Regions:
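Membrane-embedded transmembrane alpha-helical bundles that form the catalytic cores
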Residues: 1-262
Length: 262
């Protein structure tokens, strides 16, 4: 469910924000977690157990690190949590690539894993969130989060799930624990304005520029080999600008949504 899709703009976002604003401050995190899990499941419920498992591992690792004295056991917990978390990312993103490489180099006949054709939603972003959190608890930069709901919201909140940004736990902890005054009219206005500007960058600029480079160097277009030098450069520049405005637009929409929620 992309931020610029009709389903998100006219169904999910209004309902999610409306419910979030209506509930008391003490249950906002629980509501946001449910909304984030629904958003995640829209991209593929198959991967929900993996995401929940990764969150649980690092939540438990944080509590263990907080309870253990300085010494080798803490380092073992840190390494185990990081290895398990990173292994999930590597498995999902690179297993089929490695199988293809082996088939080419060693003439093996390994079949690709079809269920890995669609990656878990946001796995790169929440993997690095989890690793940064556990490392910060280990080094004493942050205290271990005791609330599983607050921790899960930090990792899986839907505004940051698709394209980040990767925000450190210490930069969000105070807001996530704030039960009164989190949402204000000014934040809602500023966030909505930021979201609209990001949406414009994505829909008006990025998508329009994408159509240009597709006509020149994309599949079904003129083709880079057949294009003149100026036209080829135009296609390359258009592709670069499309990537920039696509990422900038999504990032701005993400930040706008987060600001609207406090």
């Amino acid at each position: 469910m992309n931020f610029n899709s009709v389903v998100f703009l006219f169904c999910f976002m209004p309902l999610a924000l409306g419910l979030y604003y209506l509930v008391p401050g003490r249950v906002k995190n629980a509501v946001l977690l449910v909304e984030s899990l629904l958003f995640f499941c829209w991209g593929g419920i198959t991967w929900l157990p993996l995401a929940v498992g990764m969150v649980a591992i690092n939540y438990a690792a944080g509590l263990l690190l907080a309870s253990l004295p300085v010494g080798g056991k803490r380092k073992i917990v840190l390494i185990a949590a990081i290895v398990l978390t990173a292994a999930a990312l590597v498995y999902c993103k690179y297993t089929n690539f490695l199988l293809d490489t082996l088939n080419v180099i060693a003439s093996t006949g390994f079949a690709k894993l079809s269920f890995l054709d669609v990656l878990p939603l946001g796995i790169s972003y929440y993997t690095f969130k989890l690793i940064s959190y556990t490392a910060d608890v280990y080094t004493g930069k942050v205290k271990a989060e005791r609330s599983p709901v607050v921790f899960a919201v930090y990792v899986l909140m839907y505004p940051q799930l698709i394209i980040g940004p990767i925000v450190k736990y210490r930069d969000m902890a105070d807001v996530l624990h704030q039960t009164q005054g989190r949402c204000t009219l000014q934040k809602a206005q500023d966030g909505a304005e930021m979201f609209v500007f990001g949406l414009a960058k994505k829909v008006i600029l990025a998508d329009s520029i994408a159509a240009l480079w597709q006509d020149i160097i994309g599949t079904g277009g003129i083709g880079l080999a057949n294009a003149s030098l100026p036209l080829a450069w135009l296609g390359i520049i258009a592709y670069s600008l499309q990537l920039y405005f696509d990422f900038a637009g999504y990032s701005e929409m993400s930040n706008g949504l987060s600001l609207m929620m406090g």
